[in-house]
Amino acid sequence: MGYLKRFALYISVMILIFAIAGCGKGNETKEDSKEEQIKKSFAKTLDMYPIKNLEDLYDKEGYRDGEFKKGDKGMWTIYTDFAKSNKQGGLSNEGMVLYLDRNTRTAKGHYFVKTFYNKGKFPDRKNYKVEMKNNKIILLDKVEDTNLKKRIENFKFFGQYANLKELKNYNNGDVSINENVPSYDAKFKMSNKDENVKQLRSRYNIPTDKAPVLKMHIDGNLKGSSVGYKKLEIDFSKGGKSDLSVIDSLNFQPAKVDEDDE
């Protein structure tokens, strides 16, 4: 009788151990599932990269929800900036945002130069209006600085030369989730052999051999949301107070009522 009790106790303990182990594996599966969901959510737009002719976006449909009014074809917003620590202990970033209205088939935006200081001084912000015609950036404001003018007129968005169709091959990401917002983040280590990394090094002054980290951020529903947004960051920072990164985003929302609201 005592043997049977001990045997029953042994079986109960083993069942409990397997149950706990099963829960652990369930959590891992759930975490892996979120990583895949984040990548699949990004793939909806990143599979279009490289978009060599931005005017192709006029004929590209995005995710639509109840925020769109009847007849509104929507608007694509493409954005790229390069940010780095400056000598003042703050941050400098420079880039462009362009709004491509599918209703009017027009594209307007601005090139921006921003300098943020560590303390004791307000940031400097300068915007230069641009438009795009025949896949060419046209500067609308007068710019005396010839180097800046050249950078604006020759600017290329990351999405015009990047190729992230192999995003599914990035694995073992560091995933964090805030269900209250909701927001989702995933980080993946990149290699300096990656063609996207080589492209960035050829276009920007990146004075480090450190391999970057690919950071993916989503605000809103993973399946899609016109009020949320997604952004990519390729982070070359060395850590500490050092900032060095390229930020990219391509989002689809209802067309703006006021095109000057930039």
From Swiss-Prot:
Q: Where is the lipid attached (N-palmitoyl cysteine)?
A: 23
Membrane in keyword set: yes
How does the protein's chain sit in the membrane according to the entry? Lipid-anchor
Q: Where are the transmembrane segments?
A: none
Q: Which residues form the signal peptide?
A: 1-22
Does the keyword field hold Transcription regulation?
no
**InterPro entries recorded:** Csa (IPR007595), Csa_sf (IPR038641)
Q: Which keywords does UniProt give here?
A: Cell membrane, Lipoprotein, Membrane, Palmitate, Signal
Domain of life per record: Bacteria
Where, subcellularly, is it found? Cell membrane
**Pfam assignment, any one:** DUF576
Q: Where is the lipid attached (S-diacylglycerol cysteine)?
A: 23
Instruction: Extract one GO cellular component term from the record.
Output: plasma membrane
For this chain, the family text in UniProt reads:
Belongs to the staphylococcal tandem lipoprotein family.
The name this protein carries in UniProt is: Uncharacterized lipoprotein SAOUHSC_00402
